[in-house]
Amino acid sequence: YRLSYKVHARIGPQEQMVVCPTTFNLPCPICQEYRLLRQNPEASEDEIKALRPKERTIMNVVDLNDLDSGIQLFDMSNFLFHDMLKQEITLNEDVAVHNFTDIPGGRSLRCVFTEESFNGRKFLKIHRIDFVKRKEDWDDSILEQAVDLDKAVVVLDYDSLKKLYEDGLLGTEAEAPSGKLKKRKVTAEEEEEEEEEEEEDPKPKK
């Protein structure tokens, strides 16, 4: 019902969000640059955070307020949604909650979001999740509408992704005064998301 994947945010001249190839065990030029920056004592924390891959989750869902649309895709960062969902499942002793996606005997999610802002940008963040007993089970035929999530995310090939990243660097360099590289604004996720770098060496101190 879901796929966890990694992305790099605000890449290229158009500041796109791109899928990180490491999601599918492929080499990523942006991750390579990220690791180099982490070893550079002159690199700023903002520069490093800007390249760090972020975790997202895409899911097949049915909006109970829009049943006519059938199965839809729900895509949000783990920091803003799935981390809480995972925690709520872990802390709940109800077997039905742990198996909430089951066709027979599962649960529906009642989600409450709050609107927050950071650096002038507004975004939604999950505030509360309730697991609600369904009035009736879904028919197995609903599964025929499910999207193949592995095909729902598009991964650029290595050379295309590298060019997109480098084109973005050229753009920021051209915009920056006195030949200095223009600094990117850090997003809320980059600022507040907990570090997930157990397998990487810490950044050297100056």
Give the ranges of each region predicted by the language model.
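Compact mixed alphabeta submodule
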Residues: 64-198
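OB-fold ssDNA-binding interfaces and closely related basic DNA-contact patches used
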Residues: 1-99, 159-163, 167-171
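Intrinsically disordered, low-complexity, charge-biased tails
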Residues: 199-203
